[in-house]
Amino acid sequence: MPTVTVAVITHNRKELLKSCLSSLINGTLLPDEIRVYDNASTDGTAEMLKCEFPQVKVFENKENFGLSYCHNQALSSFTTDSLLLLDDDNIVAPDMLEKLLKKLFSDQKLGIVLPLFMNGYDDPKTVCFCGGETSLWSGRNILRDKNFPKEQETYPTYRVPNATLIKKEAAQATGLMDDRLFSTMADEDYCRRMAKLGYRAEFLLSAVTDHMQEVKRSDARRLGLTNPLQTYIFARNRAVLIKRYGMLFQFLVFMLFWQPLYHLYYLFNMLRYRAPGSFLKAYLAGIVDSISHAFTGNLPSLSDIRQRFN
């Protein structure tokens, strides 16, 4: 069996992390190495890990640098045949890792494989996510049909969140994630870069993880109106992704027609939810940076972004 490192990303979710690690350790295939990347938790996560999971290697970040930053920490240093990037809000099925590994190494051109995400929060029988992509015309989310035939084995995807098993050779060829994207769409950007090298990403529908986050979210949360940094990312990242991977005509259609509609919708919701002025300032900064990226291809560094919106 190929070797595997599991890298769990966490921030102030000690109890979720404990359940996640327990499910990994009690599976049919024990990972060769388990790492936890702690994004500056203040809830006693570090102490819990030292006490209850001494076999886990812990990396403590002094600030919350986002998912992509932690993913890059793991991608740049693992030495096994594969790497599972796992969020702390998963309770994996006992055979999930074993099934993913077998599938990943059954096909030379399969670079990434993911499990089916079930709604572990309140209805474990319900599928909450099984793949998708961003439309390069409109920027909207295109999600795979959750009512798939029982005999179907896989779904292709460009969205690779939450529990992503990556083959080492594909990771080495693709390089690191763009941490300037912070979280939203950074996974799709990475997957599309990998696809250009000839590697596919697929959901293995027989492998399962229970996603323990609440699926029903408020509109404010769904729109990123939770903090200025997330608002900035929502304003910017669609345009960045379409600029990088769409044709010129697709990008022009998006920027001249769809993007203004998105902006009007988000600005309306800022008024509706009475978002503070800092949110409006962040959103306008995202618009400016998306336009700047269209002409120059440049984006502010992760440290610059954090200084502006923290």
Q: Which ranges hold each PLM region?
A:
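Acidic/His-rich active-site region of diverse nucleotide-sugar glycosyltransferases
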Residues: I91-L176, R180
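A short, conserved alpha-helix in the catalytic core of glycosyltransferases
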Residues: Y158, A163-I166, A170-G175, R180-V208
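Short beta-strand/loop segment that forms part of the nucleotide-sugar
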Residues: D32-A40, F59-E60
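Short, acidic, metal-binding catalytic loop of nucleotide-sugar glycosyltransferases
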Residues: S22-P31
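Short aromatic/hydrophobic "clamp" motif used to bind/position activated sugar donors
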Residues: L83
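A conserved acidic beta->alpha catalytic loop
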Residues: S23, D38-E47, E63
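Non-catalytic, C-terminal membrane-associated alpha-helical segments of glycosyltransferases
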Residues: M247-N310
